[in-house]
Amino acid sequence: MRTLWIMAVLLLGVDGSLVQLWKMIFQETGKEAAKNYGLYGCNCGVGRRGKPKDATDSCCYVHKCCYKKVTGCDPKMDSYSYSWKNKAIVCGEKNPPCLKQVCECDKAVAICLRENLGTYNKKYTIYPKPFCKKADTC
């Protein structure tokens, strides 16, 4: 499993907000993001897109749509500030508008993944991209 995690880090990169996103997901779900969601379903992970397989995968689909609305920065590379207070994610007030949007997108997916932990299905953990059907546009 450690090898899978290392491969996911190398494939996905760890700059900017990806590290923050992974931390948020861990804080909300208790799951390591790269290992559990890096290639989950048709939408979780970089470069994946398709009709969601379940509610967990739908969280990632909505997250990708949220990122598409962000302008003025790179959601995957630019860092923002946030804190974990009383078991809640709080996006930093001093973030520029673009990074505030990115933080809110990441916060929403982390909460969505926590709320849908019951739908997490190990059979979708490393789901083959060719099995994904075309998704509706955001």
Curated annotation (Swiss-Prot):
Annotated keywords: Disulfide bond, Hydrolase, Lipid degradation, Lipid metabolism, Metal-binding, Myotoxin, Secreted, Signal, Toxin
Tissue expression pattern: Expressed by the venom gland.
UniProt cofactor note: Binds 1 Ca(2+) ion.
CDD domains documented for this protein: PLA2c
Localization in the cell: Secreted
Cofactor(s) annotated in UniProt: Ca(2+)
Catalytic activity line of the entry: a 1,2-diacyl-sn-glycero-3-phosphocholine + H2O = a 1-acyl-sn-glycero-3-phosphocholine + a fatty acid + H(+)
Gene3D superfamilies: Phospholipase A2 domain
Residues of the signal peptide: 1-16
Gene Ontology biological process terms, A to Z: arachidonate secretion; lipid catabolic process; negative regulation of T cell proliferation; phospholipid metabolic process
Superkingdom of origin: Eukaryota
GO molecular function terms noted in the UniProt entry: calcium ion binding; calcium-dependent phospholipase A2 activity; phospholipid binding; toxin activity
Main location: secreted
Residues at which Ca(2+) binds: 45, 47
PROSITE patterns: PA2_ASP, PA2_HIS
Annotated EC: 3.1.1.4
Catalytic residues as annotated in Swiss-Prot or TrEMBL: 63, 106
Disulfide bonds: 42-132, 44-60, 59-112, 65-138, 66-105, 73-98, 91-103
GO cellular component, one term: extracellular region
Family: Belongs to the phospholipase A2 family. Group II subfamily. K49 sub-subfamily.
Function: Snake venom phospholipase A2 (PLA2) that has strong myotoxic activity with a low phospholipase A2 activity. PLA2 catalyzes the calcium-dependent hydrolysis of the 2-acyl groups in 3-sn-phosphoglycerides.
Other notes: Is abundantly expressed in Tokunoshima and Amami-Oshima P.flavoviridis venom, but is missing in Okinawa P.flavoviridis venom. It is thought that loss of BP-I in Okinawa P.flavoviridis is due to lack of necessity for a strong toxicity exerted by BP-I in the venom as far as they feed mostly on frogs.
Protein name: Basic phospholipase A2 BP-I
